[in-house]
Amino acid sequence: EHHSNIVPWQLLCERTGAVLKVVPFTDAGELILEEYERLLASGRVKLVAVVHLSNALGTINPIKLMIELAHARNIPVLVDGAQSIPHLAVDVRALDCEFYAFSSHKIYGPSGVGVLYGKKALLEAMPPYQGGGDMIRLVTFEETEYADLPNKFEAGTPSIAGVIGLGAALDWLSAIGLDAVAAQEHELLEYATAQLREIPGLNIMGTARDKAALVAFTMQGIHPHDIGTILDREGVAIRAGHHCAQPIMQRYGVPATARASFAAYNTRDEVDALVKALWKVKELFEL
């Protein structure tokens, strides 16, 4: 899980006394569903919050099955779709999740904007989380009558330009087609994985059977930040660090990883440039 699907729940637990339980995962980066079912069977689970696609490993979690298992016990499910939304075709009705959230900047839109999908009955039952203008129908000094959905959750002046920018990004990606994007990225992932495995001392983190869009790795004796710096000088942009997923780093016993993420615009030539630059990293460290 990304920190954004951990820290808010920890804050909630501090306020309410609730207990946060975690489903463990295998060395390959796959959730252990038997442990998930065991937690559900405890009878104490109030909400399942799970990432659709791991931003640190690329694992695609079996969301549909997890939702069905939770619903069999009348447990609602919130899906963190920030990483999956630009890489997979998502149908929230088919998934039948109660909530699905994603951020604009992950789908080529402006920063500071996001989307929370929720089932209408649940949203109507929920109180506003903040107050301000435009989220009201009637205000007196004695009470406030809130506006209908979705306005009651949108206090104050919204990010008008950001929302328009997000709409343009969604239109652009929809015109290409997410199925086409997924196929392109899968081909790049397969190609890159095969090339990276040829580099001695390079260890790929996360080898789930169902995976998309990215490859995270370490190189023996070389800090990921050094990898990122050298690649930057070679004109190759990757991400190096804990990727806002420190529990995953702790699970693998590493401080950080280097991560190459693929998008709709990437090509095989760029994968070749990445691999060539990684060989140069090895040369510089004389490994």
Model features per residue range: what roles?
Residues 1-287:
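Pyridoxal 5′-phosphate
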